[in-house]
Curated annotation (Swiss-Prot):
Impact upon substituting residue 161 to R: In HP1; loss of alanine--glyoxylate aminotransferase activity; reduced expression levels; decreased protein stability; protein aggregation seen in the cytosol with a decreased aggregation propensity in the presence of pyridoxal phosphate; loss of dimerization
Modification type N6-(pyridoxal phosphate)lysine: residues: 209
Cofactor(s) needed by this chain: pyridoxal 5'-phosphate
Effect of residue 183 to N: In HP1; loss of alanine--glyoxylate aminotransferase activity; no loss of dimerization; no effect on protein stability
PTM annotation (Phosphothreonine): residues: 9
Segment forming the signal sequence: none
Gene Ontology cellular-component annotations: cytosol; intracellular membrane-bounded organelle; peroxisomal matrix; peroxisome
Annotated protein name in UniProt: Alanine--glyoxylate aminotransferase
Pfam families in the record: Aminotran_5 (PF00266)
Length: 392
């Protein structure tokens, strides 16, 4: 029998059933879940080290190899969001004193700089204003000057809406004995990406964008060059949880008996498996086409409202996340609030260096439809009519 009186009573809020609003998520992610992925989240638990779970993990690895377009054996899932995958890449590849070149044209490059500094690397940011991208010439100048072991680029910069070209960067990096790390969290499934053909050494992405899975798992793959760098390091990675040698074994990437590392998020992996199955059934090229066509339709509807697209060059616009310049005289927070309060549609403002400059509209996976474009543009039309506007 308990000997002490409880100091904390049951929270009243938890004595009521959970209630979730029905909203259309057209921000930069997470996205709405298709019925098949929602159903996967309600399946019964199995053992995290059972043969059935290992089979699911192997199927997930094959799915990642398909969406990444890679044959890398060292391909797995990180139990954490895209930030976790970025940190896993950096803590395993970089050692204190290593030179690290970063394309910092938005918040994700800024985060890479932060993590690199925490590791003790010599970090060299190539800083650009929101909306900027990198040319081969600019990167080659950085490679020649700083002689880095690793270059970071964001393929889909969701805070600014920029799609970074990747062709030629892998070959360029390898000429300077540098590895190429690419963030594809916001671009995967929405625009062409070829890990092996483009010479990308480390590629990672997240579950909650165009894959339409719940947040909390991330996808990552390493080339043989990246594996050699990680496996020949002189010091242990400072994170045990993100140690790729352990994770590679647990995910069956090293042909050795699997050993326990951590308890994986079994239910989340069911959902991720189903999201990869859906995109495999649709076909990558069809998924890319769907996002390209939906984005083009959105751009036309936005311009018909008199709104200006933040990224001027159509070739550099990220199909999955469109950035719109905040219209003159309006507070972006008023527009975002009006759209969610009156239409149950989520859009977002800027993030990091783009805060206050843009509105962000996401067309991710199953949400990339003309019907959703019509809904969000009508909501924006109403917001522009009813939100307060300052005289300029």
């Amino acid at each position: 029998m308990a000997s002490h009186k409880l100091l904390v009573t049951p929270p009243k809020a938890l004595l009521k059933p959970l209630s979730i609003p029905n909203q259309l998520l057209l921000g930069p992610g997470p996205s709405n879940l298709p019925p098949r992925i929602m159903a996967a989240g309600g399946l019964q638990m199995i053992g995290s080290m059972s043969k059935d779970m290992y089979q699911i993990m192997d199927e997930i690895k094959e799915g990642i190899q398909y969406v990444f377009q890679t044959r890398n054996p060292l391909t797995l899932v990180i139990s954490g969001s895209g930030h976790c995958a970025l940190e896993a890449a950096l803590v395993n590849v970089l050692e204190p004193g290593d030179s690290f070149l970063v394309g910092a044209n938005g918040i994700w490059g800024q985060r890479a700089v932060d993590i690199g500094e925490r590791i003790g690397a010599r970090v060299h940011p190539m800083t650009k204003d929101p909306g900027g991208h990198y040319t081969l010439q600019e990167v080659e100048e950085g490679l020649a000057q700083h002689k880095p072991v690793l270059l970071f680029l964001t393929h889909g910069e969701s805070s600014t809406g920029v799609l970074q070209p990747l062709d030629g960067f892998g070959e360029l990096c390898h000429r300077y004995k540098c590895l190429l790390l690419v963030d594809s969290v916001a671009s995967l499934g929405g625009t062409p990406l070829y890990m092996d053909r483009q010479g990308i050494d480390i590629l990672y992405s997240g579950s909650q964008k165009a894959l339409n899975a719940p947040p909390g798992t991330s996808l990552i793959s390493f080339s043989d060059k990246a594996k050699k760098k990680m496996y020949s390091r002189k010091t242990k990675p400072f994170s045990f949880y993100l140690d790729i040698k352990w994770l590679a074994n647990f995910w069956g990437c090293d042909d050795q008996p699997r050993m326990y590392h951590h308890t994986i998020p079994v239910i989340s992996l069911y959902s991720l498996r189903e999201s990869l199955a859906l995109i495999a059934e649709q076909g990558l090229e069809n998924s890319w086409r769907q996002h390209r066509e939906a984005a083009a339709y959105l751009h036309g509807r936005l311009q018909a409202l008199g709104l200006q697209l933040f990224v001027k060059d159509p070739a550099l616009r990220l199909p999955t996340v469109t950035t719109v310049a905040v219209p003159a005289g309006y507070d972006w927070r008023d527009i975002v609030s009006y759209v969610i309060d009156h239409f149950d549609i989520e859009i977002m403002g800027g993030l990091g260096p783009s805060t206050g400059k843009v509105l962000r509209i996401g067309l991710l996976g199953c949400n990339a439809t003309r019907e959703n474009v019509d809904r969000v543009t009508e909501a924006l039309r109403a917001a522009l009519q009813h939100c307060p506007k300052k005289k300029l």
